[in-house]
């Protein structure tokens, strides 16, 4: 299957139906899908070119070119399924020189010729342990950026200055989920996620370093049904932290709720949640964080971030 698409939205176009729609854009896309093994293995190869050069008032229009490869393997019921996606995204604003003042002194470097590599790998593994049906989902996503001007030989006569900082952050995410269905009306989900952001920075010696910011989270949620699924009780807890140092933050949350089908299309819902923050540095920061008249102490480590209860009555037409 081959898809050819051309889209152009002028700078004067606005819509209230979709306020997030981007105007002043022109895009050409071509995709080809190939299926093998009786449609159990599919590949999608595509290319798109996008720019915002539709108006004379646009200075230094940005051109984006994307090459993509998506592959999916679904052998059949009860077998693991695998997804692998890859995108190479290039951006160029057409600027080929740096800005200088009237005396020829350097002002700034607005050139952009960057390349991003976005990869996604996902595998879903179904299985059973006795009467319990389980599905394990593993995901890995990585986005890395490269400054072409810094590495390509065609820019050798106009290289970057030593104090230039390429301000694009790499990211990496790993997640895992275990979904279980029991022989009685109970379903549970155990989740784990770790996200790392590598922010480029420059030290006092003009060496580029990357500062890592990472968040790790885990959660457990479950639902139980009563009276032929007319009453559904939900509960869960989650935990998130950015490390184990004195400056780190831990967030612990709990939730509970229920849905009750009063009539055929009338549903009564009750949901409640509470979230706590643990900030160890509050113990010795010289500030009365909990407003109890005492400066510093064990009681200032934990605090309630938010809590609430929502009661609603919904009718489905």
PLM features: what roles do these ranges have?
Residues 1-284, 290-294, 300-317:
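Exposed, low-structure sequence patches enriched in small/polar residues
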